[in-house]
Amino acid sequence: MKFKKILLSLLICLSCFVQAKNITISRLTCEMQEGLVVVEGSPRLGWVMESPENGTRQSAYEIDIREAFTGRSIWNSGKVYSSQSQLVSTKGADIRPDNSFNYSWRVRVWDETDTPSEWSSEAKFRAVPERLSSGQWIGAITRQNAHLPEGRKFHGGELKKPEVKAAWEAVDTLAKKSICLRRTFQVGDAKEGGANRKPGKKIVEATAYVCGLGFYEFSLNGKKVGNSEFAPLWSDYDKTVYYNTYDVTEQLRRGENVVGILLGNGFYNVQGGRYRKLQISFGPPTLLFELVINYEDGTCTTVHSDNNWKYDFSPVTFNCIYGGEDYDARREQKGWNQIGFDDSHWRPVVIQEAPKGILRPQMAAPVKIMERYDIQKVTKLNADQVASASVSTKRTVDPSAFVLDMGQNLAGFPEITVRGKRGQKVTLIVAEALTEEGACNQRQTGRQHYYEYTLKGEGDETWHPRFSYYGFRYIQVEGAVLKGQKNPQKLPVLKNIQSCFVYNSAKKVSTFESSNRIFNAAHRLIGKAVRSNMQSVFTDCPHREKLGWLEQVHLNGPGLLYNYDLTAYAPQIMQNMADAQHSNGAMPTTAPEYVIFEGPGMDAFAESPEWGGSLVIFPFMYYETYGDDSLIKKYYPNMRRYVDYLKTRADKGILSFGLGDWYDYGDFRAGFSRNTPVPLVATAHYYMTVMYLVQAAKMVGNDFDIRYYTSLAQEIMVAFNKCFLHKDTAQYGTGSQCSNALPLFLQMTQDADEQDNYRPDADLNEKVFANLIKDVEAHGNRLTTGDVGNRYLIQTLARNGEHELIYKMFNHEEAPGYGFQLKFGATTLTEQWDPRQGSSWNHFMMGQIDEWFFNSLVGIRPSTTPKQGYQKFIIAPQPVGDLKYVKASYETLYGTINVDWTCENGTFTLNVSVPVNTTAVVYLPGGKEPKEIQSGTYQLVCAK
């Protein structure tokens, strides 16, 4: 495509008045988060600015921090001449953990003409409470009395051993029961329970800190606080325990109040009972609670977890993160979490052992019910189908069974509204696939997992599980009929049923649309799979394993960062990785590491450089996106320990362990890498982690490490080329796509000169790249890479301008490709390119094309200058194939970038919006020189 004559036209007229450019401050953040943020030490603040005029930028700012209630001044920055508007330091501010009040802050800015804006609205934050970690943990039984087995080896064949079975069967059944806890307290008295009460004191702030393990539901005076599911986010409880912070000022009333907590097992206490991937217990369900109430007169009262609480069994009679959930509504105690309830028959709690992990505030967004889906199709199973399905599903299918197609594969649970007689039961079996008979099929995803609801018989009853979820599209209902259906057996009537799509509520920050149907649908397919697996961690699948496999964190990292606000989620992922790191520096393949893979054939699953490398690689992706180097600096010691560990495993610079290019493609069932040698992939990632560590050493200012690891990287690169490069053919390894793409991507195509010094070899690079293209073309413009190689193949082609080839590789409806999955009827990305081969139908590990959609088709990329984090960025769209248009938006820390281009009738038209206080470097297709534009809205036109 050749373009000539560039026309640049402004869409926004310049103001004719000499005045302030009407800068308004629209979004205040603390540690890049909105709302009430809990901080350790002096926080970093940020703000987004808007202006109706082009070219607006900040020249100075002033920050004012006060105590929210009293208005007492804490810190003022004065006028600071700087364009920085994100991650602005407040070092020197007296933020004290013993202060129970919130802090408020505001900011004003000056534009490039030194004209000030109005003060912004106020935002709040509060310090991490220093006394919370000394609180008491309460529950129904201590770990010691529960006789819970210890260790992380309980999976697979280990669970079948008689001694292991006996150990788990010896556990006190009380240790896995869901319980309700309650406590009454007074509000409005100068001294709670004291003789000199002063009624009528006004509450100015009330903050609750809650940690209920494994999961909890928190209520005040009978009403649920917040709308999260599966709180707190799960972790390695021996290392880190998260608690949640709630502003409950409006929920309290003067006089008597009641706090209620419902506890479930979660990943804290996986004891099995039905399907389970593993078993592990950190202890029986437990609660840590603290409520701090500040009054207008300056006094403060605290309600905390202690032996004044009571508990009883909840209506949740079974709950397992892997196996499902049962609920007996007959066991509900009306008003149990409200004033006036008689709890004389409830039991006193016991003081339990605290989890070993460090208490940390949960900064990442909670998991919530984010979407709901209604019935799309109903199928009643006949007698023959019921009989046959009872064999194929290995469970007795009730003759009343019918199957609902909800239209969307997702992670979550059903919600029902049902009416029937007391004691009647409704069973819900969920699955993402169907058997030949049309019944729900969990063979590939872990069986048995189901939900059972026992009615109380009091009108309409609405219920959904609280402590378990699964991946499913279909719901098999047994023991009920749908409203309007014949009901000769007088079964309960389902008046409504929905699929609840449950995932992390981290903000979606982008949109993408093109004129290509397959690309649009592939983007949606990947998005649904990502959301299904974006829970407390990035899981591999929402049913069979629910484990945080680490390779997808960096291999899909750019795509994830283009689509979601990971400012708080990513630091938690890093904490999980640091917690999972072994004492010798080794990194497991999963974090949290709930199971240690041991035994014959399991070594590759225990640790693999492509998986563990996320510890080193992902912080740099975070830094490029947000301009925040804190993760690199915080986890530098962990990165170094991991690289040092890999060095101990290397033989003359070559690593020979791991999973390699997992699930690569060919005329075989996907699994272990077949096309590309495992040592090649492992060693390339070893080199990559060392190169990133060198960059990290420069950022932390460690000169010794810079020299040492630069030398190590050179040694690895030399060993790699000596071992895998075939000079006569300019092929690496087997000559597979992954074999050649990896060294090209990492710029390892080097050769020795006459003095035996290795230097970049342009001729070699060109020949290897030509071989890569030949292989893609020889396979009919199809890939042969897998989970690991996909990104390197796509991005190597893109970096070298082969966008037309990438377009051909994915603009079709054959396997391997997204179009084939769409043609098959998939609604989430599947584990294998050909879903008919089995395995999970809800994996996002093959979703690397999303990065290309944004950094190439749309053309938005962070700048390569030191100004990371999109204060300066690139827009370089690539019109390819028969694309007529692409339009997208991407919300950065500084505001939203909009890109909308069309290519019609020989003219390429690009419309862009650049946020205030940022600069875009625009490359037009075919143009030689970029154009640098400041904030505002522009149209750029190229005539063919």
Regions found by a protein language model. Give the residues of each.
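C-terminal capping/lid segments that line or modulate ligand- or cofactor-binding pockets
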Residues: V259, Y327-D328, E545, N563, ...
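Active-site acid/base region of carbohydrate-active enzymes
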Residues: F215, T286, H304-N308, D312-F313, ...
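Sec-dependent signal peptide recognition
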Residues: K2-S9
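Extracellular/oxidizing-compartment recognition motifs
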Residues: I23-R544, E551-Q552, A568, N584, ...
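Helix-terminus loop motifs that line ligand-binding clefts
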Residues: K223-P232, D236-D238, E436-Q448, T567-F672, ...
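Hydrophobic h-region of N-terminal signal peptides that target proteins for export
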Residues: L11-Q19
